[in-house]
Design a protein with these regions (language model features):
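Nucleotide/pyrophosphate-binding catalytic subdomain
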Residues: 26-258
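Charged/polar low-complexity intrinsically disordered segments
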Residues: 16-20, 28
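A conserved regulatory-domain signal marking ACT and ACT-like small-molecule sensing domains
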Residues: 279-312
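A broadly conserved detector of short glycine/acidic/proline-rich loop/turn motifs that flank catalytic sites
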Residues: 176-177, 215, 270-272, 295
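Broad gene-expression machinery/nucleic-acid interaction feature
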Residues: 36, 263, 312
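Conserved glycine-bearing catalytic or ligand-binding loops at nucleotide- and phosphate-handling centers
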Residues: 248-254, 258-287
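Intrinsic, low-complexity polybasic segments
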Residues: 2-5, 11
Length: 312
């Protein structure tokens, strides 16, 4: 599928995605290519160097297919919890069990997990002959409000990433973070890398956003609890938002909201399927679940899925 790039935006122009959120990515200077894809890999997918190498193989598959690629990564599994523990230990007042800390320093420490992963993945990709570099949130920049620890993205300037796409370079982006009005690192809260990926996909006008996890799609209910749970081929943004709000752990609620507002076609896929497995290179119908506009779903089911919370 050949991709027709839109005309360059007027200088200073930006597209509003939500009140107060501007997307500044343009397609200036690009030649036609097959597609532009944002790929996101969670903590279990990048838990160690062996798994990071597997992630790199997934990325290389898309690059070898002629696609422009940005990759958003989480911290390695367990690393964020470890960093939070360090913050709590370091901030204990002498002779007290109270943890009183500066939220800006908390963010500076906790955001480092994603920074490590992005650098490691860029190195592995380079070792495979792929032109890649790592990007921190402040370098792009991904701008946020000032709510340190639970910040919201206000705008993303994707113009430099788009320029690098035109040069054939893969952008490996540290998820979960941006830069606040105070020019300090601000983290987006738990699950924030999903939001980073969808917002980036909207900013650079990606054709698709692939969320790679340890499951191979969205199921009618938790397959670990109900063996007869069925994987859905497609689910609407509205249905996914409702399931996420009710406790489904596949995607963070905020990421689904952004995908729905900006019509970002989002696939939930497994990073543990071999990159060269049958169908993995199928652009239109890869294995997994497509989260899309309701108009793309021909037949609506009365009940799409069941979500529940274990502690209720």
């Amino acid at each position: 599928m050949e991709r027709a790039h839109p005309a360059p935006a007027e200088p200073g122009a930006s597209a509003q995605i939500l009140p107060g959120i501007a997307l500044l990515g343009t397609s200036q200077g690009l030649v036609a290519s097959m597609a532009r894809i944002v790929m996101k890999f969670g903590g279990t997918s990048v838990a160690d160097i062996a798994r990071i190498r597997n992630v790199a193989r997934h990325v290389k598959r898309e690059v070898d297919s002629g696609h422009e690629v940005a990759v958003v990564v989480s911290a390695m599994a367990g690393k964020t919890n470890e960093l939070v523990g360090w913050v709590q230990e370091a901030s204990k007042a002498e002779g007290s069990n109270l943890n009183i800390y500066d939220a800006r320093e908390y963010d500076a420490v906790v955001a480092s997990g994603e920074q490590v992963t992005s650098g490691l993945l860029a190195l592995v990709l380079q070792s495979m002959g792929v032109d890649a570099r790592s990007w921190q949130g402040w370098q792009i920049p991904v701008r946020t409000d000032n709510s340190h620890g639970a910040a919201r993205i206000t705008d993303i300037d994707g113009s430099e990433l788009v320029r690098r796409f035109g040069m054939g370079q893969v952008a490996v982006v540290a998820g979960f973070q941006g830069v606040g009005p105070d020019n300090r690192i601000a983290t987006l809260g738990r699950g924030g890398s999903d939001t980073s990926a969808v917002a980036l996909a909207a900013a650079v006008k990606a054709d698709r956003c692939d969320i790679y996890t340890d499951v191979d799609g969205v199921y009618t209910t938790d397959p670990r609890v109900e063996p007869k749970a069925r994987r859905l081929a497609k689910i609407s943004f509205e249905e996914m938002l409702e399931m996420a709000s009710l406790g489904a752990k596949v995607l963070q609620v905020r990421s689904v909201e952004l995908a729905m507002v900006h019509k970002v076609r989002t696939f939930v896929r497994s990073s543990f399927v071999e990159p060269d497995a049958p169908g993995m290179g199928d652009f239109d119908n890869p294995p997994g679940t497509l989260i899309c506009d309701e108009d793309e779903i021909v037949e609506q089911q009365v009940v799409t899925g069941i979500a529940y919370a274990k502690d209720e």
